[in-house]
Amino acid sequence: MDFPASENLFPGPVLGIETSCDETAAAVLDGSGRILAEIVLSQYDDHARFGGVVPEIAARAHLAYLPGMVTEVMDKAGLRFQDLAAIAATSGPGLIGGLLVGAGLGKGLALAAKRPFIAINHLEAHALAALLPALGGVAEITSGEHFPFLLMLLSGGHCQCILVEGVGRYRRLGGTIDDAVGEAFDKVGKLLGLGWPGGPALERLALQGNPHALAFPRPMKGRVGCDFSFSGLKTAVAQYVARFPDGPLPLSDAADIAASFQAAVADVMADRATAALAMADEIAPAKMLVVSGGVAANAAIRAALSTAAEHRGIAMLAPPPRLCTDNAVMVAWAGLHRLKYGAVSGLDHAPLPRWPLDAPDMALPESTTP
């Protein structure tokens, strides 16, 4: 979607940098939210042989790839650093080594170009990603008509229900009491011999299976509140797989396990979304359900949550799959919002491996709160 300059409702352009885990990414967005350039580099080959992300390797890879990537993305956008309105970098939560690399480069560029630096909360970037102009229209988004909404943040490291009352205004309603949903997908994928990361491979395998073949448990379904638990479901899958001790699972059995596990997760997600929406009714009724994070790319889960939202008479909105996983577009987009309200950061801002969305420092300056 191409917006003329007159429709720029944010100061821009903004460079976004993402290095919180194992994707190295950079992107530039203009003041309308239009993507001028973006690059995402997966570190899959660096970590696959270890069966998961190795923090030290991830940090070294960010250090090797990021400077050249930022230069390339600026060239693609046709901009100099002095043309930017600000530089935004993920500064938490995440793996501290990677955060230090990305935030450090962002601060250095901001200092050299004499531009503001904006420390971005990775969770806020996911929260706002579904509101990109290409999905709704920038005038409608910036008018605040979408707030409040219920965010279901579903990824390898996070599984939370959050009431989003505005930029910088987040109320956590519930979350996982053990594994994150993406972590559960990866662990079950490993049980099925699918390698790492297991989530996408499990989803593909599930297409060949019967989702009703196995009656796996639905942890927390029907419980008061909107918390999650996946350890019991993961254990149930492990116990079933243990019935095949003499070699690899037959493809048909593996596919049925994958499909039945995925169906159980989708069922739980729909139930927890319904419960969270009911909780929001007591505070500020949600106008829509937003689903974000890497697991939001899963078609079965998207469908289940869309149905749950439809039953409540509201829409479900999710980024396109490529923007569900970690990327710098969402970082730059969050940076545009924070810059609009003057919520810039000092160069002494320290990256935080843990940084909840409802932390006091997430609030916008009082004089600019919408």
UniProtKB/Swiss-Prot annotation:
GO terms for cellular component: cytoplasm. It is found in: Cytoplasm. Substrate binds at residues 153-157, 186, 199, 298. GO terms for biological process: tRNA threonylcarbamoyladenosine modification. It catalyses: L-threonylcarbamoyladenylate + adenosine(37) in tRNA = N(6)-L-threonylcarbamoyladenosine(37) in tRNA + AMP + H(+). PANTHER family: TRNA N6-ADENOSINE THREONYLCARBAMOYLTRANSFERASE, TRNA N6-ADENOSINE THREONYLCARBAMOYLTRANSFERASE, MITOCHONDRIAL. This is tRNA N6-adenosine threonylcarbamoyltransferase.
